[in-house]
């Protein structure tokens, strides 16, 4: 899966290009992001293009969260479509992973993290 990777200061911003995050691409999504993280432990997933996510896609997001959490960091989501947000809320992912309306809000939320 193609993922646009950008740095904003010490925050890695990853934007999945595909409209679906599911069984067909979740492993490559997870691999690309974890490979790009390096020593970075602040991750924003910009979900602006994602229209659908299934359990494997949620698992990939959780895997990325575990990876950054193990390094003392965090993962934030932004620009999540209503259908995707419903799935994330159904599995209660929004309780362990903050969701922001915009990329800037998500990036700014890291200001208090070392």
Say what each PLM segment does:
Residues 99-114:
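A charged, well-structured terminal subsegment
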Residues 4-6, 78, 100:
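General small-molecule cofactor/ligand-binding pocket signal
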Residues 23-97:
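Amphipathic alpha-helical interaction surfaces in cytosolic regulatory modules
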Residues 1-4, 112-114:
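Non-catalytic signal-transmission and effector/linker regions of two-component phosphorelay proteins
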């Amino acid at each position: 899966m193609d993922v646009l990777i950008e740095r904003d200061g010490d925050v890695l911003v990853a934007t999945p290009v595909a409209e679906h995050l599911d069984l067909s691409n979740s492993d490559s999504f997870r691999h690309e992001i974890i490979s790009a993280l390096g020593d970075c432990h602040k991750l924003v997933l910009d979900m602006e293009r994602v229209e659908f996510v299934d359990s494997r896609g949620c698992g990939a997001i959780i895997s990325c969260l575990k990876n950054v959490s193990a390094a003392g960091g965090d993962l934030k989501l932004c620009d999540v479509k209503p259908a995707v947000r419903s799935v994330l809320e159904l599995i209660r992912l929004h309780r362990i992973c903050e969701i922001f309306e915009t990329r800037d809000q998500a990036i700014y939320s890291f200001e208090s993290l070392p």
